[in-house]
């Protein structure tokens, strides 16, 4: 039976949340489009004001106990993203939600949410109208957990950064590496190109150079992100095709 859960204002839950083991996020989407920011990185004139979740509060039970929850941002924030991403970052078998959240004065950050609100996040970039483009998830440091890859300021600085979620002493995102010279988005495009592939057991990020003329691959080697030029790039669609080993 579907029961409607509470509508939650995010300003009340910006502190780190502890996710109950019995709860599972089964669906996530953005809602409440807003024109209060209008950065328009995807060519649109609106971003999102809320994160909508469907949460099973009795995961593993014979019958699901589904609740709809809305995590609503303060008026000074928007979600500046295409779609929320459900992924298990801490290896507990339950997914977290990974999103791009923007403070209108400080730019974007990569945020991780649970059923009741924010778990942790990277720092904001630090300047208005500065954005980051998620690249994907992979086990870059071979510890058995999925890490997060994104390109910070893909239209300007073009810096790939990789983070992993640590749960002790409290949840936080630890940076594993960064490298400049790779991007995955062009201003106005509705798609984020390329992503993470795993070939021969090794996670690597596929993207473009700053001129969109060369295909680039980034791997974590010896604790450092290493960038390689792997050939000419004539179309952004090549980056998506390259995700197939």
Give residue spans per PLM region.
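N-terminal secretory signal peptides that target proteins for export/translocation
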Residues: 1-3
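Bacterial N-terminal signal peptides
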Residues: 5-16
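Beta-propeller-forming repeat regions
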Residues: 20-245
